[in-house]
Amino acid sequence: MNAPLDGFVVVDLSSGIAGGYCTKLFADGGAGVVKVEAPEGDPLRAWSASGAPVDAAAGGALFSFLACSKRSVVVDPEGDLQAVEDLLAGADAVVWSAGSRLADMDSLRPQRIHERHPHLVVTDRKSTRLNSSHD
C-alpha cells in the first residue's frame, strides 16, 4: 500500500521544533525528507526535554523523534552549496526557517530559492510569528 505522499520530496532547511515537526509530518505521510545541516549540526541536537545537557554529536531524544524517517546530509556553507542546489532542483517543497548558519545565507533565503526554483513550494516558518525580525 502506498502512503499519501509517496514520491513527494521535501528539503528541510529548518532548525528548531516547528520546522522539525512540520517535516516529520511530511515524512510520516510518506514523503522523502532530506534534512540539510551545516557541519555544526542543528542546534536542536543539543536540546533535552528536561533542560539537562545533551551530547550534540549523539543527539537528544527530541531531535531523534523529529528526525525519524528523514535522510540527513551535511553541507559546508562555504563550499558545498551546489549540493543544496542539486537537492532543491529535484524536490517538490522546501521548509525553511531562520536560525542556522546554512539557512541564514542570502542565497538560501526563501525568496532567493523561489527565484531559482519556481517549481518548489517554499514554506517559511517565520510567517507564523508576529513581529519577526527576519526578512
What are these regions (language model features)?
Residues 1-129:
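N-terminal helix-loop segment corresponding to the beta1-alpha1 unit
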Residues 130-135:
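Short "domain-exit" segments at the C-terminal end of structured domains
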